[in-house]
Amino acid sequence: MKINSHYTDLSTHYLFHDIDLRVNEYLAHHPGEHLLRMGVGDVTRPLPPVIVEAMCSAAEELEHEDTFRGYGPENGYEWLQQCIIDHDFKPRGIEFQPDEIFIGEGAGSDLGNLSELFASDNTVAIPDPTYPAYVDANMMAGRKIVLLPCLKENNFVPERPEEKVDIIYLCFPNNPTGAVLTHEQLRLWVDYARNNHSIIIFDAAYEAYISSPDTPHSIYEIEGAKEVAVEVHSFSKSAGFTSVRCGYTVVPYDTGLQAMWMRRQCTKYNGTAYVSQRAAQATYTPEGRAAVNANVAYYMETAQMIRQGLQEAGLQVFGGINAPYIWCATPNGMGSWDFFDLLLNRCKTICTPGVGFGPSGEGYVRFSAFSHREDVLRALERIHTDLSL
């Protein structure tokens, strides 16, 4: 028996596991201390009543023989696929067939599993810093990875690689930097992919947070993108589905990958829970849209509080305008983990070290607007009074 040796190339611990180790060590020496958590990007607001009601109604259907449902379609129920098309794409002049919309358990799974469609000798371009799963999934397959630095000097927008790459990961609005692309910037990436016969995996998990008019909500707003792009969406950060688990991935026929992804899902995925899909459908009702918009507005209000509070404390910040993340430069050239430790020990506040997202994240930390509002206000007060920059 031989194991996949590429797993030995992975970091021993996942970023958030390393954070937990440091936090637990701190708490072991300071039992009972209340820490203010502004790091991990899990949501904190409860599910809107309209979504809970839809889930309860769906669960009650399963109690009765005449409405009971077993396995559903591997790629999702057509009523949800059509709902997504009608609300997320048609208003932007984008047309899809239901079979091009694949309902899944969330963006994270599909972003990792999509790599199974591609040979291991492909070259993959990934922005740096980035969501760690992009790198890990491709390291597991033994692919060559080209990192694209996202720096203050390029407004945290990666330059197109000079060499030909086969697979490109893009996430906008970006996690962790909060950066966004204009239509023109995204068009250049689509043109690159078309000219080089590449595929773009576009992570649109934070699309609901876009407010700027020149920021595209979907890569398919760009002409020709259906030929070269797969787009991944999530209900987690907009509707609070981090425990409900539901998202969707668009695999256009024109990419040549739709049949492959369908075959993969039929073999390895038995479909998303009926109750979760009814919950997702409820987000598109008028009451559901209002609830989602209220969630987004609440978190973005928190983001503005964080931006303003950090700036008043003398820190330089980016993002937090079209995304729920604030990318904060560490003071005086301090390392990411050093600043993490300083905030933990002096302000009892937890952030996310930027270097955990990649080498170009060194010298930054990430703050999350998904944090509890009370924790945010107390943390900002402590940073302002106790940090002494």
Sequence positions of predicted segments:
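N-terminal small-domain helix-loop-helix segment of the aminotransferase-like
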Residues: 2, 6-105, 283-286, 389
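Conserved core of the PLP fold type I
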Residues: 66-193, 208-212, 216-222
